[in-house]
């Protein structure tokens, strides 16, 4: 009975695999395909796992309803036609099919290339050993711990706060929902297991909307700095002045913030990507920009000793990417801070208008309290609002609103010769030509091998042909500055992100896509892939421009890596849940120091912005806490 149940559960997945990657044409055998994809799907949260399986079952049923036969019993060409017919029903259905395709191709591709990926991970010695950290498992932590200050979150913001407070002589405890990873794990762990383990929701978090936006966020000691690209741009002076002048955020004054940006850059050891490790993907972008007369340059990154293995997104296997788990956190621990891992903070403890600590939950469901007079929340823009609401501190009407995502899109170009986009730095070079004028930042970007296959069009034979040509593909992406139109809410204890992209940002995306198309053709691409469902490869710039003009913007593939603004800091009590010093309004003893306090989109990768603002909030916290001791 159990075997029959297992077969019944796996059949819709095997059926989809037979249509997507037909084994008769060189795709994986059904059992192999199911094993590969199940390895990832079983790691998804229950709601995501249910949605995937329901979608697969719906596709299997649709084959019966439209042809009278199951997908595996059809000819491979007919299977592909069935998927095309289903996807053509509506933009929403097409997006759902593309979402299933993306999940399946990520899992299958990562396993296909696992041997190469792990071989490259082990090709060189580690650039540096793991840092000395005082990490205590929540299971080993007492039920009650006392400290001067507790920091919720160990990412870019939390790490800088912890270092500042500890160096000021305060007894600091940092609580982290995820766990500590070691460089040896990054060198030896299967890529799917790294991806599923390092990201919140196994990397399947999505902002609901039209279109939906994929929203990966790290969950580990070191936060998203463990899995980001390492790109370190300063916010422009115009952005800093906007925060100061429009929001009354004195902490963002360029003179003050500039010094803290210097500190963040020095902590991270930021430097431009060397050409010798950039990889051909980045060099093609620079060459194309030069031929068009556009401003472009290697990207500044925090990766001293990087060899260009393109695995930043699943944990650097050489410890070259210098996330805060390798600098600010060990510096905080050297000054006396402690980190408790596997501890999800459920609520802030407070009475009579003053906080006195936090309550966290261990994986086994038991709780632990950290009692402290100062609570600094650095859980990130999607998690901080929910924590404050669960704590009874979410009364401000703008909390959870004003969400900006800095949405990103991508085009791929086919070249006559090999590019091997994944042999080099994951995010290596940037075009700045449209940044000030249109809010569009273009970057040469790739993924670990096999994990970016969702850019390829079609199903069946067409898709397999593109997968075979993966080494000849270059990928350029763009992010557009957006307004804070999204929201973060809690539904039955789960975070729900909603983001409907505004018309102004759709116009920016069109500018971005046309500019990327020009770059790819200038670089020598013979065909350009848009990722728009049903759109064929483009062989000329006018053809691409025509397709982009006619395309439904709701069918664009969007991702976002930079959520900000959900607890904006500023002088206006009606507009900003957090005041101009970083203190949460309505309660004493609570500060916020993460991406949620950035009052508008920073218009660049936000790591430096978050760290510099966190330093500013930390200084305010020290002045307040030390002043009353």
Swiss-Prot record:
The keyword Oxidoreductase applies. It comes from the Bacteria. The keyword Oxidoreductase applies. The active site is at 562 (proton acceptor). One of its GO terms (cellular component) is cytosol. One of its GO terms (molecular function) is flavin adenine dinucleotide binding. Its EC number is 1.1.-.-. Keywords: FAD, Flavoprotein, Oxidoreductase. Pfam families: GMC_oxred_C (PF05199), GMC_oxred_N (PF00732), NAD_binding_8 (PF13450). Its cofactor is FAD. Belongs to the GMC oxidoreductase family. This is Uncharacterized GMC-type oxidoreductase Rv0492c.
